[in-house]
């Protein structure tokens, strides 16, 4: 974990109430998520990392309250205090040859970096991305540029398969030996209970400190209590109690 000031180099609307922010600066430590300090607010906002490279990271977030509204209005050049290098992420080594990535809504962005790592290891990657409707679709082209196959589902049927990610999976029946999922808890529960074989899920819980001190994001697992921010947010399928 490292705290530093990072400068906004991009902050733009990419879908309904959804923004892409790029931060640049020295000393960025890679992690599964970051904790951003917003001026005027005591609690930081945890945001998952969509992409990362030396001195530069990309975040995708949705305006859901006053804090993220303030964040969306920040101009290029503004500096933010950010904790980087947080969380235990996905394990690309767990996949032997064929990976299935299942994302829903704001659970889609962190899977993009995972897709790039899997492809760099020579593995086949199928991504199934679920959204409510067409104007909420994000990063579809970015996934198509990386993955072997990309399937889209929308609840209203405006794009791709009508229904949920599990409907798209049932229709396409992709081959995989390991799956990774991130999105709404109800979606991940169905995915983990439906898909056979091993996999991992990235959980989302309300966080206080984001560093494991306050235990505000503690969950019960088959291995006892675990902190989502410190021991996760990624957990093996077999660890989770739904």
Model-derived segments and their meaning:
Residues 2-78:
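Ferredoxin-reductase
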Residues 10, 51, 152-154, 201-203, ...:
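Structural signal for conserved beta-strand scaffold positions within catalytic alpha/beta enzyme cores
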Residues 42-49, 87-94, 229:
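Short, Lys/Arg- and Gly-enriched loop/turn segments at beta-strand edges
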Residues 66-203:
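FNR/FR-type flavoprotein reductase catalytic core
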Residues 185-186, 204-233:
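Local cysteine-cluster metal-coordination motifs and their immediate loop/turn environment
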Residues 233-242:
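Short microdomains enriched in Cys/His and/or Lys/Arg
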